[in-house]
A protein has these predicted regions:
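Gly/Ala-rich beta-loop-alpha elbow adjacent to hydrolase catalytic centers
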Residues: 212, 216
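Non-catalytic accessory segments of hydrolases
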Residues: 2-177, 349, 376, 380, ...
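Short glycine-enriched nucleophile-adjacent loop
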Residues: 217-229
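Short beta-to-alpha linker loops that shape the active-site pocket of alpha/beta-hydrolase fold enzymes
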Residues: 162-164, 244, 458
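Mobile gating loops/cap/lid regions near enzyme active sites that modulate substrate access
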Residues: 399-427, 433-583
Length: 583
């Protein structure tokens, strides 16, 4: 099984593994602005669930979603998880999909209805092209239960948003009509609904923290940078796991890279039979809105449902992230952000044996044609600069030799499967996709005097092969305190020896830190030194040098480290973020 296949197996989602079956004794009722909902009481967790609550009118395709504008008498049920929005990837397996998908779920502790509780709003990941709030791995019951046990109860919310082309249409026509970045706008509308209605569930609208992983963390960053950092009072804190940084730049080539997004749109139009004759004209959107959803879905499956991305539209994103960070045009709220030690094993190429292989991959993914216009440098020279900062030395690549002691040699099985420069390749692409943007954000927050915290997750879950290291997504079960392993196969907390007990203890530590931040905007809470092996989790400060300090989560505890690993490579990426990567 390849690393990619192993990762997909870990992420498998049989629908039978959805949240613990609710045991209804009496249905909780809540009256919001539009009417009254009946939820479900779960006696096992002593929690109330309100599931599949709409936060918008059924969306008009390729249009900005509108808030609810009708009221009703009587009681509507909120007993079932919503469908997924249309998406393209394994996270869709086993789930019904629909364009009518803008719903959210609320999990609250029972009996605390008028306490003004802090709220944690989860934004799922999946590349902005797959996933949904009904995913059992995002079961909010466990972290809500943990919050009650700590004496710091919170309300959990999870939300859907449109994906792929439905949510992230690109091209000149979409920008002209103001319908780019619709998925992020959906999230914004959900946060507005929470702001207006969460008090009815016992939540405090002034104590909302948004959190997400991967493209969910990218979404969290998008909300922080949205509208030039405008503060709409929708949330006061943000947590980004493996993805916080720059929502723009998926099509590198510098700040004038527009050909590939337009080409993606044109190819999509040509793949829709009812609209292909209009490709290249200015009237394609009207046609795309009229055809059946099944025709759009089939076209995306054939033309690339995973090819869509956020774009600079002059409205939701008024400027590039690089410029906003430099000028302080972002929402100045406390953030807790980080990533996993070996992110690159999920994003690097395979079978990279020599410099030529690596150069080819870098040119495809990072430094394409056109950068000469924005950098004034020769493309090959830029590749040389990058490779100089990432030497072919397995002792400094990922996964580390501590995590996986095997040194890849010519002729061994790992060389055949992964390539001789596997570790070097992983380090470059992991830093590019996940790490440098996060570090750049921590530094910007520090320069502008805003509290931020950084972590590095360094625990390899049960079922993750050693050669994959501590890869992408592996912290999610620990954050949610999902020690039952709901939605996972195998259970990340299974295994032999002391690992299960140690992993569960670390999950308690991590989820406690997140709960502390949601309550206090500080992960330390009242017992920081006790929580972090005698240390306090420090805010990210630059007074002692060019890099701050953060917490590392290990299987046997935590320690504090200076955030300066692979500094040369990530500094180069940050310096070229706008001119090469277009963010």
């Amino acid at each position: 099984m390849s690393l990619i296949d192993a990762g997909r197996a870990l992420l498998s989602l049989p629908q039978a593994l959805l949240y613990p079956p609710p045991q209804t004794t009496s249905a909780p009722l809540v009256t919001v602005r539009n009417g009254t909902y009946s939820g479900v009481y779960n006696s096992q967790y002593d929690q109330d669930y309100f599931l599949g609550v709409p936060f918008a009118q059924p969306p008009v395709r390729f249009s900005i979603a509108q808030g609810l504008n009708t009221t009703w008498d009587g009681i509507r049920t909120a007993h079932e998880y919503p469908v997924h929005c249309y998406g393209y990837g394994w996270d869709q397996d086993g789930f019904e999909q629909s364009e009518d998908c803008l719903y959210l779920n609320i999990v609250r502790p029972a009996g605390l209805h008028n306490h003004g509780l802090p709220v944690a709003a989860w934004i799922h990941g999946g590349g902005l092209w797959m996933g949904g709030a009904a995913d059992p791995r995002y079961n909010l019951s466990f972290i809500v239960e943990q919050s009650v046990a700590l004496g710091k109860p919170v309300i959990g919310v999870s939300l859907n948003y449109r994906l792929s082309a439905f949510g992230f249409l690109m091209g000149k026509e979409a920008i002209k009509e103001g319908v780019a970045n619709l998925g992020f706008r959906d999230q914004r509308l959900a946060l507005s609904w929470i702001n207006e209605n969460i008090a009815a569930f016992g939540g405090d609208p002034n104590k909302v923290t948004i959190f997400g992983e991967s493209s969910g963390a990218e979404s969290v960053a998008a909300q922080v940078f949205a509208f030039n950092g405008r503060d709409d009072g929708l949330f006061r804190g943000a947590i980004g796991e493996s993805g916080f940084g720059a929502p723009l730049g998926r099509y590198p080539g510098g700040f004038n890279a527009t050909e590939r997004p337009q080409g993606t749109y044109d190819s999509f139009v040509r793949s829709v039979p009812s609209c292909k004759k209009l490709a290249g004209s200015d009237s394609t959107l009207d046609c795309l809105r009229r055809v059946p959803s099944e025709e759009i879905d089939l076209a995306l499956r054939s033309s690339g449902g995973q090819s869509w991305a956020p774009v600079l539209d002059g409205d939701f994103f008024a400027d590039y992230t690089t410029n906003q960070l430099a000028s302080g045009r972002f929402l100045k709220i406390p953030i807790l952000i980080g990533a996993n030690t070996d992110e690159g094993t999920s994003f690097g190429f395979r079978r990279v044996d020599d410099d030529d292989d690596l150069r080819a991959g870098i040119k495809v993914m990072m430094i394409p044609y056109g950068v000469e216009k924005t950098t004034g440098k020769i493309r090959d020279g830029l590749v040389d600069e990058l490779l100089e900062r990432y030497p072919n030395n397995q002792s400094i690549g990922i996964p580390s030799l501590e995590t996986w002691p095997h040194v890849i040699q010519p002729g061994d099985g790992y060389a055949e499967e992964f390539g001789l420069q596997y570790r070097r390749d992983n380090a470059i692409f992991g830093d590019y996709v996940m790490q440098y943007q996060r570090r750049r954000a921590n530094k910007a927050w520090a320069k502008h005097g805003v509290p931020s915290y950084v972590y590095r997750f360094n625990i390899r879950p049960n079922g993750q092969p050693p050669e994959a290291g501590v890869g992408h997504f592996q912290e999610v079960a620990f954050v949610f305190h999902n020690t039952n392993g709901d939605g996972y196969e195998p259970n990340p907390f299974g295994g032999n020896g002391t690992y299960p007990a140690d992993a569960k203890a670390m999950s308690k530590t991590i989820s406690t830190a997140w709960i502390n931040f949601i309550n206090d905007l500080d992960p330390n809470g009242d017992s920081g030194p006790e929580l972090f092996n005698g240390n306090k989790w420090p805010t990210y400060e630059l007074s002692g040098g060019p890099n701050g300090k953060g917490v590392v989560f290990n299987i046997n505890g935590t320690h504090i480290e200076v955030d300066d690993w692979r500094a040369g490579g990530m500094e180069w990426m940050a310096e070229h973020a706008l001119t090469v990567f277009g963010n």
